[in-house]
Amino acid sequence: MGQKINPLGFRLGTTQGHHSLWFSQPKNYSEGLQEDQKIRDCIKNYVQKNMRTSSGVEGIARIEIKKRIDLIQVIIFMGFPKLLIESRPRGIEELQTTLQKEFNCVNRKLNIAVTRIAKPYGNPNILAEFIAGQLKNRVSFRKAMKKAIELTEQADTKGIQIQIAGRIDGKEIARVEWIREGRVPLQTIRAKIDYCSYTVRTIYGVLGIKIWIFLDQE
């Protein structure tokens, strides 16, 4: 059986960049890592609570964290930043104060910026949220997959593969279903591939969604 490595880690340094940029002493490294995870979770929870969207898509593509001695710079890449800004005009300031309270940044300044990504449905995280929303609303998984592929075609991608695993459509026996459109060269290191795995809780149990999107060849 072919073993699948995580496509993002496999391409680190060639087509993929790091989402956290900072240095620390080896003894403080684990603290910094946990802090990053907490910041990401805190932002996702805040967005979930304060954004009421019809499609159920929060639209966070990724969160980049850059740290200096006196500053934590957080950049949120979103597909639909309007939703956050319109639903809460002072949303970003609120989020900033919430994070500062959480991490009691006394000697460090916290700065949050929101950046819009050009083609939201060319991003696997946003697409996975879309599919998860469809599955929660009991739409058939094949319909959800086909709709997702239609959305990526508008975003000029070279290829996409979607895999859903678990008790699909509430069947007693769990199975894995997948669909591929276009090319997805996972073995080519210079191929720019974006990937995400997403867990969705339905009334029948947990489903796992994996999405590979082939964007471009370097």
Swiss-Prot record:
SUPFAM superfamilies, per database record: Prokaryotic type KH domain (KH-domain type II), Ribosomal protein S3 C-terminal domain
Organism expressing this protein natively: Nicotiana tomentosiformis (Tobacco)
Family in the record: Belongs to the universal ribosomal protein uS3 family.
Gene coding for it: rps3
Cell compartment(s), UniProt: Plastid, Chloroplast
Domain of life from the UniProt record: Eukaryota
GO MF annotations, alphabetized: rRNA binding; structural constituent of ribosome
Protein name per Swiss-Prot or TrEMBL: Small ribosomal subunit protein uS3c
Major localization listed first in the record, in broad terms: plastid
